[in-house]
């Protein structure tokens, strides 16, 4: 997968990167009481959409907050709906001796592998139902499994790095956490972009 290195630093090439990441960190702080979550998710969906079309910069502006809130809230609900069957599977497996920890890994990996498809498809169309196109999702997963595994590993790495913000107390955590999310959603878009560029079927609406 190309541009892995870019995911660490592309955001810092935006002329207003500090201001945009600082605002994102502020919304992350509000996310501690849930209020900021839709705004953060709405912004990240824009990043994924841009990346899926091969566009890195500029980072989306923090404008049209109403639109960001609505799309982010819908995406949050989508995540909850997906978590229900995954949670049921978890509780079925967790009571089987010796494989409880495997259940946790299985659930986490399963959701991580399908999330790029869900995020980009919803970000492109804004259609709630498009996030539940299971046949398209399965085809995308089979055709892009290698890159999806890379993104999964990279997302773990970014979240580990984000916690180094603890060294700078709470504000540092929020700043590095938002940076990590920008990097992860950038990679979500890149998976789709590279698949479409090389002719691999994605079933992700091209809008």
Residue ranges of each PLM-predicted region?
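Selective recognition of hydrophobic, aromatic-rich stretches within alpha-helical transmembrane segments
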Residues: 29-53, 94-131, 162-199
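N-terminal, charge-rich interaction modules
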Residues: 12, 23, 41, 45-46, ...
């Amino acid at each position: 997968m190309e541009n892995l290195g870019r995911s660490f630093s592309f955001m810092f090439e935006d002329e207003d990167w500090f201001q945009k990441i600082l605002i994102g960190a502020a919304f992350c702080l509000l996310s501690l009481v849930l209020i900021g979550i839709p705004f953060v998710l709405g912004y990240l969906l824009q990043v994924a959409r841009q990346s899926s079309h091969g566009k890195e910069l500029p980072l989306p502006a923090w404008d049209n907050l109403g639109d960001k809130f609505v799309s982010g809230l819908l995406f949050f609900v989508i995540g909850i709906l997906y978590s229900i069957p995954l949670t049921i599977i978890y509780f079925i497996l967790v009571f089987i001796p010796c494989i409880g920890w495997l259940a946790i890994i299985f659930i986490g990996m399963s959701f991580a592998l399908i999330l790029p498809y869900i995020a980009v498809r919803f970000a492109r169309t804004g259609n709630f139902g498009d996030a539940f196109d299971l046949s398209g999702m399965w085809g995308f997963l089979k055709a892009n499994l290698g890159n999806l595994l890379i993104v999964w590993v990279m997302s773990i790495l970014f979240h580990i790095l984000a916690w180094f913000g603890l060294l700078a107390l709470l504000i540092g955590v929020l700043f590095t956490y938002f940076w990590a999310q920008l990097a992860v959603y950038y990679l979500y878009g890149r998976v789709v972009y590279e698949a479409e560029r090389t002719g691999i079927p994605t079933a992700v609406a091209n809008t």
